[in-house]
Amino acid sequence: MVPPVQVSPLIKLGRYSALFLGVAYGAKRYNYLKPRAEEERRIAAEEKKKQDELKRIERELAEAQEDSILK
């Protein structure tokens, strides 16, 4: 097995600093984007509800048209 390589404390500090800054940035960015994504999901759900309602109405009208033609 190869012995571990000695790494400068300055390089270690730089690596851990970059890691910490990346985690902090990611948390900040996530907290910034989370409300926007929730709003987009809410709007998409409302639009889907409206589309489903329109499709249901169209289907009922089509069935009513078929029933009236056949009778």
Swiss-Prot record:
Key words of the record: Acetylation, ATP synthesis, CF(0), Hydrogen ion transport, Ion transport, Membrane, Mitochondrion, Mitochondrion inner membrane, Phosphoprotein, Transport
Location of N6-acetyllysine modifications: 34
Main location: mitochondrion
Compartments where found: Mitochondrion; Mitochondrion inner membrane
UniProt KW Coiled coil keyword: no
Gene Ontology BP terms: proton motive force-driven mitochondrial ATP synthesis
Matching Pfam families: ATP-synt_E
GO terms for MF: proton-transporting ATP synthase activity, rotational mechanism
Keyword Acetylation: yes
Tree of life domain: Eukaryota
Leader peptide range in chain numbering: none
InterPro entries per record: ATP_synth_F0_esu_mt
PANTHER family per the UniProt record, alphabetical: ATP SYNTHASE E CHAIN, MITOCHONDRIAL, ATP SYNTHASE SUBUNIT E, MITOCHONDRIAL
Subunit annotation: Component of the ATP synthase complex composed at least of ATP5F1A/subunit alpha, ATP5F1B/subunit beta, ATP5MC1/subunit c (homooctomer), MT-ATP6/subunit a, MT-ATP8/subunit 8, ATP5ME/subunit e, ATP5MF/subunit f, ATP5MG/subunit g, ATP5MK/subunit k, ATP5MJ/subunit j, ATP5F1C/subunit gamma, ATP5F1D/subunit delta, ATP5F1E/subunit epsilon, ATP5PF/subunit F6, ATP5PB/subunit b, ATP5PD/subunit d, ATP5PO/subunit OSCP.
Biological function: Subunit e, of the mitochondrial membrane ATP synthase complex (F(1)F(0) ATP synthase or Complex V) that produces ATP from ADP in the presence of a proton gradient across the membrane which is generated by electron transport complexes of the respiratory chain. ATP synthase complex consist of a soluble F(1) head domain - the catalytic core - and a membrane F(1) domain - the membrane proton channel. These two domains are linked by a central stalk rotating inside the F(1) region and a stationary peripheral stalk.
Protein family according to the UniProt entry: Belongs to the ATPase e subunit family.
Protein name per UniProt: ATP synthase F(0) complex subunit e, mitochondrial
Species in which this protein is naturally found: Sus scrofa (Pig)
Classification of source organism: Eukaryota, Metazoa, Chordata, Craniata, Vertebrata
The encoding gene: ATP5ME
